[in-house]
Amino acid sequence: MTEQRMALVASPTTAAQEAATELRAIYEWHPIERADLVVALGGDGFMLRTLHAMLDRHRILPVFGMNLGTVGFLMNDWKPDLLELRLQQARAITVLPLRMDVETVEGQRHSVPAINEVSLLRETRETAKIEVLVDGRVVLPELVCDGVLVSTPAGSTAYNLSAQGPILPLESSLLALTPISPFRPRRWRGAILPNKNAISFRVLDAIKRPVSAVADQREVRDVSLIRVGIDKTSPLTLLFDPEHALDDRITMEQFAV
């Protein structure tokens, strides 16, 4: 197998920087511009920033993460030894990001990628009133809530989970549609949709009840219309150790207390 050129990126935390120093003393590293893959040291948040940086540069490489953060759901165990062999044996999982297209009440338009989720949030003490459409069909004429989000499998253990949304297997072709503190309809607790569906939101009474739209950490305020769908033009690749029990972690996360 041809030797792959590795680039190293690390979170600014002390643990990640110390690990990076250790790896630099053992292996040969290359700038991202000349690399074939990226080794990322940190937690899930740093992995998210690494993937967004590649989307911004329009140069997308496979990423092998090692956990030096807290949860590390998208990361492998930290081990400095035999890294090149681990990379050769790694299992690749494709993650499709979301694309959020929004229009504001003033007519401005924005298009923003999201890897974890797109969330709509009320901006004031007034509850949001939102019409929900799937593939152009109105499925909820009026959702009264603090907000609502669309999550990818990669993001389903993050904000989605804290909003009582379902955990989705990382390799599934599904999206979670999860309300945030819903008031009406009282019995609606969300939906699981095929990722081929296009999801749209119309903000009702957007002047009195302003809503912001957030794609991961990128916010657009005072929105009126939001369209969310999978972006198949920018697939991301995460690399995992063959023994990485991802399915087991997904299962056990649902019973965490």
From Swiss-Prot:
Required cofactor(s): a divalent metal cation
Q: Where in the cell is it found?
A: Cytoplasm
Q: What is its EC number?
A: 2.7.1.23
Per its record, the protein catalyses:
NAD(+) + ATP = ADP + NADP(+) + H(+)
GO BP, one annotated term = NADP biosynthetic process
Q: Which domain of life is it from?
A: Bacteria
Q: Which GO terms describe its cellular component?
A: cytoplasm
GO MF, one term, reads: NAD binding
Name the UniProt key words of this record, in alphabetical order: ATP-binding, Cytoplasm, Kinase, NAD, NADP, Nucleotide-binding, Transferase
Active-site feature positions: D44 (proton acceptor)
SUPFAM superfamilies assigned? NAD kinase/diacylglycerol kinase-like
Q: Output the PANTHER family linked to this UniProt entry.
A: NAD KINASE
**Function statement:** Involved in the regulation of the intracellular balance of NAD and NADP, and is a key enzyme in the biosynthesis of NADP. Catalyzes specifically the phosphorylation on 2'-hydroxyl of the adenosine moiety of NAD to yield NADP.
Q: Which family does it belong to?
A: Belongs to the NAD kinase family.
Q: What is this protein called?
A: NAD kinase
Species per Swiss-Prot/TrEMBL record: Rhizorhabdus wittichii (strain DSM 6014 / CCUG 31198 / JCM 15750 / NBRC 105917 / EY 4224 / RW1) (Sphingomonas wittichii)
Species lineage: Bacteria, Pseudomonadati, Pseudomonadota, Alphaproteobacteria, Sphingomonadales
Recorded name of the encoding gene: nadK
